Regions:
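N-terminal cap/lid segment of alpha/beta-hydrolase-fold proteins
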Residues: 1-31
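Alpha/beta-hydrolase active-site loop
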Residues: 86-108
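Short, surface-exposed "cap/lid" segments of acyl-processing enzymes
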Residues: 31-73
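Primarily recognizes the serine-hydrolase "nucleophile elbow" in alpha/beta-hydrolase
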Residues: 105-168, 200
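Cap/lid segment of the alpha/beta-hydrolase catalytic domain
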Residues: 74-90
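Conserved alpha/beta-hydrolase "acid-adjacent" motif
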Residues: 234-243
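Catalytic histidine-centered segment of alpha/beta-hydrolase-like enzymes
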Residues: 265-274
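Short beta-strand/loop motif that positions the catalytic acidic residue
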Residues: 221, 227-229
Length: 328
């Protein structure tokens, strides 16, 4: 029987400006506090999920002076009892208040600089937050498993069926936005279903499935960005390098772009925790040490070598890097 991972963390709680309480864990370095990594979990998850990854990241980051913070967001679990909450009834735009409160908590703990790391739907949220607020305390973004919910659902049920379901959800939402869609589709309110699966919604920040999409959120970000995906992510509808290439081409204002594929890892990075920990530590170390500059490198499969970097707008004319799979 596998022993549960022992994680040296403190249990904490914060309150958002609109009165929502969020539980979480933090693991802090003993000495100098260089920056904080705030991990934003995915759809319906909780702060305590993925304990092997919490242990891997905290034990790697803390000796480097990086604090590790992971909180529930108001979309944790499936549904709450006192009022309509949880993933089924979450409003994506309210994630801004959650992340703002998380950053404020880290600042009160003595961290003046923050890297936001979002996994799955958490990646949508941190990108949306950074593009909308341009919070100067945020010095970098890590997008982990940044898969479009729309692309993933089209892969699962087909584009025609998804369009039919969206049309029905629109009819339900006109009567009552909080009414549930058919149970076979999952446990969602009509409003939440449309937020997840209707193209052009605020949550649709990874529109690689749509030719000529604007990518407004990613193109509005100016801090260093890393996109990390598992080579066996079950929600991918294309090769991992193609996905990374789409992000690279649209991170037009980011100071730098790093794309990494973790070999053998699935969407939750199970079994790839060590490689992911190495990759994240390397990216965060560069960002913290140099502020916004990242050394040139190449796309890697795994976290032990130098990450692939595309320079920001200020230096792109002098040097560009392209993976062999990226179209010219």
């Amino acid at each position: 029987m596998t022993k549960p991972a022992r994680v040296p963390v403190s249990l904490v709680r914060l309150r958002t400006r609109d009165g929502v309480w969020l539980d979480g864990v933090i693991a802090e370095p003993r000495r100098r506090r260089r920056a904080a990594l705030i991990w934003v979990h995915g759809l319906g998850s909780v702060f305590s999920s993925g304990q092997p990854l919490i242990q891997e990241l905290s034990t790697r980051l803390n000796p480097a002076g990086i604090g590790y913070f992971k909180f529930n967001n108001r979309g944790h679990d499936v549904v709450a009892g006192r009022h309509l909450a949880g993933a089924a009834f979450e409003r994506f735009g309210q994630s801004v208040e959650d992340i703002r409160a998380m950053i404020g908590f880290a600042v009160k703990c003595g961290y003046g600089r923050v890297i936001l790391a979002g996994h799955s739907t958490g990646a949508n949220k941190v990108l949306h937050y950074a593009a909308r607020t341009r919070d100067r305390r945020v010095i970098g973004l890590v997008l982990l498993g940044p898969i479009s919910d729309i692309a993933g659902e089209m892969k699962r049920i087909g584009g025609r069926e998804l369009r039919r379901r969206v049309a029905l959800a629109e009819r339900i939402a006109r009567r009552d936005p909080e009414a549930l869609v058919p149970r076979a589709w999952g446990f969602w309110s009509a409003r939440r279903y449309l937020s997840l699966y209707r193209p052009g919604e605020a949550e649709d920040v990874f529109p690689y499935y749509r030719p000529n999409a604007r990518w407004a959120a990613l193109r509005g970000v100016r801090v260093p960005v890393a996109a990390i995906v598992g080579s066996r992510d079950e929600y991918l509808d294309r090769r991992p390098a193609e996905l990374i290439g789409a992000f690279e081409r649209n991170a037009t204002r980011a100071r730098s772009f790093t794309g990494i594929v973790i070999p053998g890892a699935r969407h939750g990075f199970q079994g790839g925790e060590r490689a992911l920990g190495r990759a994240m530590l390397r990216f965060i170390g560069y960002v913290c040490r140099r502020g916004v500059r990242v050394p040139a490198g190449r796309l890697t499969r795994g976290g032990g070598r130098r990450p692939r970097v595309r320079r920001g707008a200020a230096t792109r004319r002098r040097r560009r890097h392209r993976s062999p799979s990226q179209p010219a």
